[in-house]
Amino acid sequence: MYSEKKHLIQSSINSRDIDKSRSAVPTVVEQSGRGERAFDIYSRLLRERIIFLGTGINDQVSDSLVAQLLFLEAEDPHKDIQIYINSPGGSVTAGLAIYDTMQQISPDVVTICFGVAASMGAFLLSGGAKGKRLALPNSRIMIHQPLGGAQGQAVEIEIQAKEILFLKKTLNSLLAKHTNQSLEKINEDTERDYFLSPEEAVEYGLIDKVIKNDK
């Protein structure tokens, strides 16, 4: 599991590549008394305590996001941190590293779904601070059980199957905690891809509020 095969256990939409990197990142230029200074847009938003999860989740993405959370906690342990989520999911263990950090740090973590929060993306969305889990009106949210693939000798397949079942139990128990749904219902609903609108996600307990456009 913790060898090169650990990434066989995933939680994602297959049509999205979890290693897809951002392309053409915009740059913003700020004027100061010392002249101009250029930032990539994500670094600039980090100064406003805004983090983007806009790709699939792997170890590299997880390490970067955890580092940003820890940095912002050190900057101000009392001010909220916002995570915007548009992710198809990815590595379960990498996602749990982000989740554990969200729960461990002092600031409340506001989670906001834009686009799609699927699989581990939806799990992280639900793990935001209660009352501060949000979604934009046309976003989509999907939960399901971890996906797994096993290869090698029979004993290796058995070990990986046990690990998948362990991760499934862990994720479903935490989803039940964050949604106030019964574990039995979570187990049933995650047997297949379970898509929800933002309004349905509020009713389900995955989020707390839909951000409405009042213009």
Curated annotation (Swiss-Prot):
The keyword Cell membrane is annotated on this UniProt entry: no
Catalytic center residues: 119 (nucleophile), 144
Reaction(s) the record says it catalyses: Hydrolysis of proteins to small peptides in the presence of ATP and magnesium. alpha-casein is the usual test substrate. In the absence of ATP, only oligopeptides shorter than five residues are hydrolyzed (such as succinyl-Leu-Tyr-|-NHMec, and Leu-Tyr-Leu-|-Tyr-Trp, in which cleavage of the -Tyr-|-Leu- and -Tyr-|-Trp bonds also occurs)
Transmembrane segments: none
Class of this enzyme: hydrolase
Any one GO molecular-function label of the UniProt entry: ATPase binding
Gene3D superfamilies: 2-enoyl-CoA Hydratase, Chain A, domain 1
Compartments where located: Cytoplasm
Main location: cytoplasm
Keyword Cytoplasm listed: yes
EC numbers: 3.4.21.92
CC terms in the record's Gene Ontology section: cytoplasm; endopeptidase Clp complex
Biological-process GO terms, alphabetical: protein quality control for misfolded or incompletely synthesized proteins
Function description: Cleaves peptides in various proteins in a process that requires ATP hydrolysis. Has a chymotrypsin-like activity. Plays a major role in the degradation of misfolded proteins.
Record-stated family: Belongs to the peptidase S14 family.
Subunit structure: Fourteen ClpP subunits assemble into 2 heptameric rings which stack back to back to give a disk-like structure with a central cavity, resembling the structure of eukaryotic proteasomes.
UniProt name for this protein: ATP-dependent Clp protease proteolytic subunit 3
Species the sequence originates in: Prochlorococcus marinus subsp. pastoris (strain CCMP1986 / NIES-2087 / MED4)
